[in-house]
Amino acid sequence: MAFIPRTLTEDNLELVTQVNHFANFLLTNLLVDLLAAAGKSRVVMVSSLAHGWVQNGLNYEDVTWEKSQYSMTAAYGNSKLANILFAKEFGRRHQERGIRSYSVHPGTVLTELGRDIRNKLPVFLVPVTDYLSSLFLMTPKGGAQTILHCAVEPGLSQETGLYYANCQVKTPSKAAQSSEEARKLWQFSSDIVGDISPLKIR
């Protein structure tokens, strides 16, 4: 989810952050025992190059944008940075249980992600932007390749917590490389999710 006006959920969380990060955090932790029991499991977090839009790390004091001017791009970038940090810390915590995790930039893919922006364009610009998008953006099939690579490539079985793009390990932004930041996000997310679900996070 991306590029929508600031919206609060019934849990009083900002919608983009809840859908893109907190929901993933909750679901993955609900499944963790099943993943461990299955053996040699993998979790792939779909992040984005947009994580690099966040220069100074996550702002834990204002995740709902109550105190600052809401930015659609920053909210999306924050959630994608959180995906990388979550994959990093999840991998560290669960590698001994046989679970591997990866974060992925799938590429700039022609999807409905920017539909809210498209719907606000002048009518005469819509066919122009649609045409240009078809020329320069990846197809969904192309965008799925790095995700599938991380999910099934045998050569990755000993790796965990890494960031991939174009089916190769890439170096994410400085903020996304911090193990301390990954642990901080984990604890923060555990506290938030713990208020919503009785889940015991490990």
Q: Which stretches of residues belong to each language-model region?
A:
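Short glycine/threonine-rich loop-to-helix capping motif typified by GTGT followed
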Residues: R115, A175-A176
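A short, mixed-charge helix-start or loop-turn motif at secondary-structure junctions
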Residues: E10, S68, M72, T129-S133, ...
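Generic recognition of well-ordered alpha-helical segments
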Residues: E89, T146-H149, F188
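C-terminal helical subdomain
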Residues: S79, S103, P127-K170, S179-R183
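Alpha/beta-hydrolase superfamily serine-hydrolase fold, recognizing
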Residues: A2-I4, S173, E180
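Rossmann-fold NAD(P)H-dependent dehydrogenase/reductase core
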Residues: M1-P122, V193-R202
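Intracellular terminal tails of multi-pass secondary transporters
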Residues: Q177-R202
